[in-house]
Amino acid sequence: MKIITNLNKKHDYQFNVTTSNGFSINCRFKEVENIEYHNDTGMVVTVFNDYKKGIASTNDLSSASIEKTIAKAENISKNTQPDEYQGLPESNVTLSMSKNLGIFYPKDLKTDDMASIAKTCEEEAFNFDKRIVNSEGATFSAANNEHMILNTKEAFGSFKSTDYSLSCITLAEENKLMERDYWYSSARDYNKLETAKQIGIKAAKRTISRLGAKTISTRSCPVIFSPEMASSLIGSFLSAISGPAIYKKSSFLLEKLNQRIFPEFINIKEKPHLADGSGTKPYDCDGVLTIEKDIIQNGTLNTYLLDTYSSRKLNMKCTGNGVITNITMEPDLPCPSNLIETLEDGILITEMMGSGANILTGDYSRGAFGYLIKNGKIEHPVTEITVASNLLKMFENIKSIGNDFDLRNNIRTGSILIDNITIGGTT
């Protein structure tokens, strides 16, 4: 605190401090292949000097190192162009204390025990089917994290979190052709991870299901995006309503505020303080309190996602979105337990390649792997296909959300069924 009191009173300062310690164990063919321990600390110093901004960072939190980092940030600020929208957030929107968020579950874990769990995970995959012929191993990881923020407008906050995960990657072979897939579980609470057996078997099932993939002809048809792929679509939507995309006029959703983007049964909410949420945070990177909000209500876009800078640039209220926290899809219609059974003919997409979402135009084109659906059942896997459409059209054509919600990531959604998408095939 002595360093803080010795700062230049003509400037504003912000300090973001993060610490993380934990380990990762990879096991392959019943042997420990790699163990990594980490104990990381970092500080980012931001200086605002007459609307000029300077940033510097350090991994050394000694007094001497912090003083040097502050001086470096000050020097950088002197050589940047002034920007009237730069500066700390107003003091009335920043936090003074942090709440218990339900994301910190420390546990004393022994590396030998975790190695045994990883070995079991891989072994279950091999035992599931003789066509599982190889593996990239199973990996267990754990981390304890802490974040603190303070600035010279007397804002202060901190929170702790834990992260645990277990994953397995397998390879299957049939008729001299090989396929690769995986499964993983992640949680804030170790006790909420899927079991090693569940993860190993799911990895094996997913890999086996890819064998015998065929090419198909080009067509337009209904498409189901698996929860993992559906979250990617919603991620593109979030990018398009971010402050930078809006003030740079580089979004296909520019001037779409208060207009219907999705069908009326779609609601999308941000829940920053969700217990066990992978994106849970009490404040954003500027120190602004995060708040629950209805981003999409009855299909209508209610708000952009603005940090301090973009809100000033757009002359709009800051929404505390210097970070995206937990996003949840909450449809008003019942969620089918199995969207596949609702389709006479269509495609299930489980993997996409490349970054083919153009946020400026909304044009969407990505390579994909999936499964052909006939009469409510999967007929066979399909490969060498391309998903081509426009994001705005895709959002408008959402027909249903499945109840298979993926709770592992910060974007929580089930499978999404979208009508009339062009699938590019080989003929």
Please state what every model-predicted region is:
Residues 98, 256-427:
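Dual-mode signal for accessory low-complexity, basic/Gly-rich regions
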Residues 1-281, 285, 297-300, 325, ...:
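Active-site bordering "gate/hinge" segments
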